[in-house]
């Protein structure tokens, strides 16, 4: 697989924005958010201050208030990381983020316990919408961007559940 280190990241802002009201983002192999639509930024508050989505998920101050099924979403993230590592073991962005995340106890514990499920493609997340005081069921899905190691993360809002 080709690393994206030397490739220019395409401007997908308009495409991502057209996916509203569903949260969507374009990520590097190291899960750094390069572009995100307004719904993604609104739901995943505090993400802009984190170096990447993984860091936000494991140590973000607001994450426990937003991601209500943290264990399940953590398993999903780890599964995707392991799958991407199997597909692109030499990707510098991916190996860099794994090295940066390894000192984080929760991340390391989940990394050591997790195995890749039969289909890590979609996993429902239960997410609190802090702006509207509601709880959303979001099917999270990741696609690799062509032959690069970049990713598109799309959450399809399936409905609300009782808070």
Predicted regions: what is each one?
Residues 14-16, 20-22, 27-120, 128, 156-160:
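PAS-family sensory domains
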Residues 1-11:
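Short, charged amphipathic alpha-helical "coupling" segments at sensory-output junctions
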Residues 7-8, 37, 106-108, 133-139:
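Short amphipathic alpha-helical surface micro-motifs
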Residues 115-163:
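Low-complexity, glycine/alanine/valine/leucine- and proline-rich hydrophobic stretches
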């Amino acid at each position: 697989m080709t690393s994206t280190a030397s490739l220019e990241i395409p401007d997908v802002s308009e495409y991502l924005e057209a996916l509203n009201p569903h949260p969507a983002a374009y990520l590097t192999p190291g899960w750094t958010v390069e572009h995100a639509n307004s719904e993604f930024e609104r739901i995943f508050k505090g993400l802009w201050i984190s170096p990447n989505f993984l860091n936000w998920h494991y140590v973000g101050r607001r994450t426990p208030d937003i991601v209500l099924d943290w264990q399940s979403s953590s398993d999903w993230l780890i599964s995707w990381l392991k799958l991407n590592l199997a597909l692109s073991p030499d990707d510098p962005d991916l190996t860099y983020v794994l090295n940066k995340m390894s000192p984080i106890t929760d991340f390391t514990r989940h990394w050591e316990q997790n195995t890749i499920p039969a289909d890590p493609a979609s996993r429902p997340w239960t997410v609190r919408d802090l702006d509207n005081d509601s709880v959303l069921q979001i099917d999270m899905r990741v696609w690799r961007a062509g032959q690069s190691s970049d990713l598109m993360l799309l959450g399809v809002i399936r409905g609300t559940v009782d808070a």
